[in-house]
Swiss-Prot record:
Name under which the protein is recorded: Transmembrane 6 superfamily member 2
Function: Regulator of liver fat metabolism influencing triglyceride secretion and hepatic lipid droplet content. May function as sterol isomerase.
Membrane topology: Multi-pass membrane protein
Family note: Belongs to the TM6SF family.
PROSITE patterns per UniProt: EXPERA (PS51751)
Organism: Mus musculus
Keyword Endoplasmic reticulum found: yes
């Protein structure tokens, strides 16, 4: 997709986060958690009014435009937080990480901020530009939906269940409202019409007649999905304290981060066990049997979710904020990195396959009879 002309205006509004955060950081009143949450709500409200007044036509055409522009602002804030916590910036968001959301200072929180400040930010700019030019952005929206939902579903419960549960601030309840956004946005994105395809019914039937051996890419993906499902079950058993020797060796020698009391890694593995595992099985079925029209959409959602999850999990496992005893040992770093990288790349290859040649997943229409063709010609 080409870079839309609106990107410049959206970038300008989002980068207002830099002077705003710097000025707020200099005000001593923001050492109180209540002031932090009230100011955060006020800034978001003023930003919405500014977007509404400047881009009323775009919001009328698609209300998600306002969401993408506002979230591009928060993405810059998250990137500033991540860079500051890693020592690349100073004096911008100290007040927020101390009195707003201290759990953003964890390794997992830092990598969530990096993902939001880069991948999500680019998605917001592109989708806002697509709305401006009245173009489709359904595929990008589905990817963002999965990524955003996964980050929220792991991060918010992890804040409650982990060692930072005693440091909850009023800002946490403002973050809970974020859970409503993917629900509303997901309904709107799924209700958008799909991009038209050029496949005729005869082409669809011809593609769906092919056996699995005639589709080596699908066969390879099914093999991958089987191994990914087995690995997901294994890591789920590991975090559930399975007493077998294999689980004991794995959690101490390969992924000790799963024992970290911050609770994010354990919740991540449980999300995989209860949600990713069923998808692996259903996706393998959809690749073997034709006509599963749901797979292309959900493959995009799943790719976004796994991409965000694996980025945060892999980064936090090796970050300096993670205690040394919970970091990946140097002698098993290659095994850890390769296995988790494959787990992240596989869903993206599946989504690419579904978008590349979707005929296998379309509903096959019955071929028209000669009598019907004669009627059409008459």
């Amino acid at each position: 997709m080409d870079i839309p002309p609106l990107a410049g205006r959206t970038v300008a509004m989002s980068f207002c986060a830099l002077p705003v955060s710097y000025l707020l950081n200099q005000v001593s009143a923001f050492s109180q958690p209540l002031f932090v949450v009230l100011t955060s709500a006020l800034i978001l409200g003023l930003l919405f009014l500014a977007v509404y007044s400047l881009s009323h036509g775009e919001i009328t055409y698609d209300p998600l435009y306002a969401v993408f522009v506002i979230f591009s602002f928060t993405s810059v804030v998250d990137l500033v937080i991540a860079l500051q916590e890693d020592g690349y910036m100073m004096g911008f968001m100290d007040f927020y990480t101390k009195e707003g959301e201290p759990y953003l200072r964890t390794a997992h929180g830092i990598f969530i901020c990096y993902w939001d400040g880069t991948v999500h930010y680019l998605l917001y700019l592109t989708m806002a530009g697509a709305i401006r030019k009245r173009k489709r952005y359904r595929n990008l929206g589905l990817y963002w939906l999965g990524s955003f939902a996964m980050s929220i579903l792991v991060f918010l419960p992890g804040n409650i269940l982990g060692k930072y549960s005693s440091e909850m601030r009023p800002t946490f309840f403002l973050a809970i409202l974020y859970m409503l956004v993917p629900c509303w946005a997901g309904v709107r994105i799924f209700n958008q019409s799909r991009a038209p395809t050029s496949y005729t019914p005869d082409m669809v039937q011809e593609e769906q007649k092919k056996s699995l051996l005639q589709r080596p890419a699908d066969l390879a993906l099914i093999v991958y999905l089987i191994f990914a499902a087995l690995f997901t079950v294994f890591r789920g058993l590991v975090v559930l304290d399975c007493p077998t020797d294999a689980c004991f060796i794995y959690i101490y020698q390969y992924e000790p981060y799963l024992r970290d009391p911050v609770a994010y890694p354990k919740l991540q593995m449980l999300m995989y066990l209860f949600y990713a595992l069923p998808f692996y099985c259903l996706a393998a079925y959809a690749l073997a049997f034709p006509g599963c029209s749901w797979l292309p959409d959900w493959a995009l959602v799943f790719a976004g979710a796994i991409g965000q999850a694996q980025f945060s999990h892999m980064g936090a496992s090796m970050h300096m904020r993670t205690p040394f005893t919970y970091r990946v040992p140097e002698d098993t770093w290659a095994t850890f990195f390769l296995s988790n990288l494959l787990l992240a790349l596989g869903p993206h290859l599946l989504a690419f396959r579904c978008l590349w040649r979707p005929a296998f997943f379309l509903h096959a229409a019955l071929p028209s009879s000669p009598q019907d063709q004669d009627k059409k010609q008459q």
